[in-house]
Regions:
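Membrane-embedded alpha-helical bundles of multi-pass transporters/translocases
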Residues: 2-268, 272
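Short "domain-exit" segments at the C-terminal end of structured domains
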Residues: 273-277
Length: 277
């Protein structure tokens, strides 16, 4: 059975929401905790790096859990729904840090940021893994994947274009308050978009998934030189994207400087985001 336009649209809406959440964390968490709350750059960077190493083990472990899941609602939708609710709560907590002394804030950031990564993986892995289970048609699977990737880019672009505008509009002179409001808005939109996605998608194709242990996955990876090249390329590409998204705001604030740095930053974002591939 071919997918309907309604299902493809709902899947794309889900991608918009989940990548709005990802982009907000990836692009602004360092700025929020370093420049707004005053933690040291070295500590924030250390936590971000530790989280990426943790993800290397968390992602395949999550894949194993999803593969072993059996429920009346299917294998994937329960994880997408529960992961979305938890991640929305954690995202808000990430950008609504309470007033704490430096040591307590360091602990708070470390715990909440790791939890954000875990809960995001809870919904992201099953979101993409669901594609083969909702249609048997190879063309539909390719189209659904393309819709998801395209709409994910829309979600990222929305965050890049409007976050700092909303921070200023909602928080006034307080960036701390502005980020809290933005996180609340994005969290609510995230839940709504994933509810739309879960309501429209149905697992119509039995997808028996052979599971391997995390140890077996890494063992197979290290024995395959071609897979290592692909993984290495992905790491380099994602590192470049992550560094750019995190540090471009610092370039405008400290290198270009001046009272109008936000206007210059937003001008570039509004020009570049709609034209990127």
């Amino acid at each position: 059975m071919e997918l309907t336009l309604k299902q493809k649209t709902a899947f794309g809406i889900g991608a918009v929401g989940k990548d709005m959440v990802y982009a907000l964390s990836a692009s602004y968490v360092m700025y929020y905790y370093q420049d707004v709350l005053g933690l040291s750059a070295s500590f924030v960077g250390l936590v971000l790096m530790a989280a990426r190493f943790f993800d290397a083990f968390n992602d395949p472990f999550m894949g194993v859990l999803v593969a072993k899941t059996r429920t009346r609602w299917g294998r994937f939708r329960p994880w997408i729904f529960s992961g979305t609710l938890l991640n929305a709560l954690v995202l808000y907590a990430l950008f609504a840090a309470p007033v704490l002394d430096e040591a307590a804030l360091m602990v708070y950031f470390s715990v909440v940021y790791i939890l954000w990564g875990v809960t995001y993986t809870m919904m992201d892995i099953p979101y993409w893994s669901m594609i083969p289970a909702v249609t048997r048609t190879p063309k539909d699977r390719e189209n659904l994947s393309m819709v998801g990737r395209t709409c994910a880019g829309v979600g990222s672009a929305l965050i890049a274009m409007f976050t700092m505008l909303l921070v200023g509009a909602l928080g006034g002179d307080s960036e701390r308050a502005g980020f809290r409001w933005v996180a609340l808005i994005v969290s609510v939109l995230f839940v709504v978009t994933e509810l739309v996605c879960c309501a429209a998608m149905r697992e119509t194709t039995p997808s028996e998934m052979k599971t391997a242990t995390v140890k077996e996955m890494f063992s197979a990876l290290f024995r395959n030189d071609q897979a290592m090249v692909v993984v290495g390329s992905i790491v380099l590409i994602n590192s470049a994207l992550y560094l750019t998204s995190n540090f471009i705001i610092y370039f405008f604030k400290y290198d270009l400087g001046g009272a109008g740095w936000k206007a210059s930053y937003l001008s570039l974002i509004h020009i570049s985001e709609p034209t990127r591939p």
